[in-house]
Structures are given as structure tokens and as C-alpha cells.
Amino acid sequence: MGLEKDLPPGEQLRALFRPFLEQLAASDLSPKTIQKHVDNMWALGGEFIRDLHSDSALRGKPVELVLRQMIEYGGPLLYHGGEDQQRSFDSTCRKFHRFLAKTAR
């Protein structure tokens, strides 16, 4: 499992992810498409925590700020995965970025 110090940023991520995932669940998207987005959000959380481990300076910054910068132009490069998976991941990250921008107003 993860480290104890990963719990607070993980909880903050979950709070940011939840409204987006709830909107997806209430949408007209197919269950398969919704599941792809859910899987991609799980991967985004993992990449976020991985970045915290590789760059400790990120721990001092607000989670939402780091996340927005991470997904501004798509998602970060996936640690594991092929081209198709990266495209799907980038699409979800762009969709999530638009959602965050819209709900911040």
C-alpha cells in the first residue's frame, strides 16, 4: 500500500475527483465509456502520487494547483501503457481540466 504521508493529498484528490465522477455517472455516456474515464482517473491519482515521490517540492504546494498544472494540456506520460491508453488518458485529463475550470467559476 502507500505511505502515510500520501493519505492527505490522496484525500484531497478524491474530493476533487468525486464531483467529476458523479457527473459522468449521471451523463448519457455508455457504461463502458464511463468505466474508461474512471480507470483513467485512478491512473491520474497514481501518477500524481508518483510525482510527489519524485519531486518532494510538490508536497508544499496546494494539491489542486499541482493537479491543474499536471493536466493542463492532457495527462502526464503514463508510467505503464501504450499509445492508445495514453490517448484515452489524455482525453479524460482534458475533460477533467475543463470540468475543474467550469466549476471554479
Where are these regions (language model features)?
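Non-catalytic DNA-binding core/recognition domains of DNA-processing enzymes
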Residues: 29-103
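Short terminal alpha-helical segments
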Residues: 1-29
